[in-house]
Amino acid sequence: MRLPIAVGALAAIAAGASAFAQGISDPGERAFQYCFSCHSVEPNQTEVLSGPNLNGVIGRPIASKAGFEYSDAMKSFGAGKVWTPELIAQFIQDPKSMVPGTVMEKPPGPRNPAERAALLDYLKKPR
């Protein structure tokens, strides 16, 4: 009985986020709505969410954002690497396939290459 309720709740949340995102004119910011419940891009965000702050993520060493506790899997995967747009695009399509043992689940979007490109452009913007 709990599973149908949980699935229904998730569907309602996704529908609400989708409706909210439709009012956002920037396609990258709209694509980021898939991410904002776990991540922030605000430079002065002090509250630690369930995912690291993504402000300045492109070009940053993987698993290096101060104040966030990364999984051992992510630390191992990221050793000596930096986030590139290509790596991020690949990672968000299936995090657990790319980094077995990561805590991050597969997000419901961005769903297609155009949305992913818009998201990456959004993440590149200085704040």
Describe each PLM feature range.
Residues 1-7:
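Bacterial N-terminal signal peptides that target proteins for export
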Residues 7-16:
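Bacterial N-terminal signal peptides
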Residues 15-32, 42-50:
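Electrostatic cytochrome c docking/interface patches
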Residues 34-37:
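Short, cysteine/histidine-rich loop/knuckle motifs that typically chelate Zn2+
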Residues 39-45, 59, 93:
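Detector for the c-type heme attachment site
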Residues 51-58:
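Short cysteine/histidine-rich metal-coordination sites, predominantly Zn2+-binding motifs
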Residues 64-82:
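Short Fe-S-cluster ligation motifs
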Residues 82-127:
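C-terminal capping alpha-helices of c-type cytochrome domains
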